């Protein structure tokens, strides 16, 4: 998945969000499924009903935050199902979280709590046990990805295409 690395690296260069954190967010949010959506709520435990949120794609960005991202970045053609746009969105979000909440960009645990809860509700995360469990999981995944990237970086940074 060389292009995934290339796009994540471009997001890192643009926003400063570490590649391993971008990938850990995507792993947790969508398991790298470009069409991921939250499961439908069931009526009477049987009948599929509404989805609990508008989140969609690799990053599971909700519509309102996605619109804000497109407006602020000028990336009007961005789509949540495109990996390139999803990692750019995550980079933008991590960068904005650092500005708004003063959370270091390499703090996977606190960055994910802000991503999961939203900027406004971040201060209440200590009451949300599920968010804390998810953030610990993302922190572990980010640590694993960081080690793997360290081992593979030389191969990944090579230009994969020869232009004649």
Regions found by a protein language model. Give the residues of each.
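Short, solvent-exposed mixed-charge patches
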Residues: 163-164
């Amino acid at each position: 998945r060389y292009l995934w690395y290339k796009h994540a690296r471009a997001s890192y260069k643009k926003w400063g969000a570490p590649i391993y954190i971008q990938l850990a967010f995507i792993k947790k949010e969508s398991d790298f499924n470009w069409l991921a959506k939250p499961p439908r709520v069931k009526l009477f435990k049987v009948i599929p009903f509404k989805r609990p949120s508008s989140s969609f794609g690799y990053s599971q960005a909700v519509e309102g935050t996605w619109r804000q991202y497109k407006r602020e970045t000028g990336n009007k053609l961005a789509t949540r199902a495109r990996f390139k746009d999803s990692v750019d969105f995550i980079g933008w979000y991590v960068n904005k979280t650092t500005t708004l909440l003063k959370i270091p960009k390499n703090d996977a645990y606190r960055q994910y709590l802000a991503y999961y809860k939203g900027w406004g509700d971040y201060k209440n995360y200590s009451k949300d046990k599920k968010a804390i469990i998810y953030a610990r999981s993302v922190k572990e995944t980010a640590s694993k990805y960081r080690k793997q990237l360290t081992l593979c970086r030389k191969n990944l940074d090579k230009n994969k295409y020869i232009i004649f």
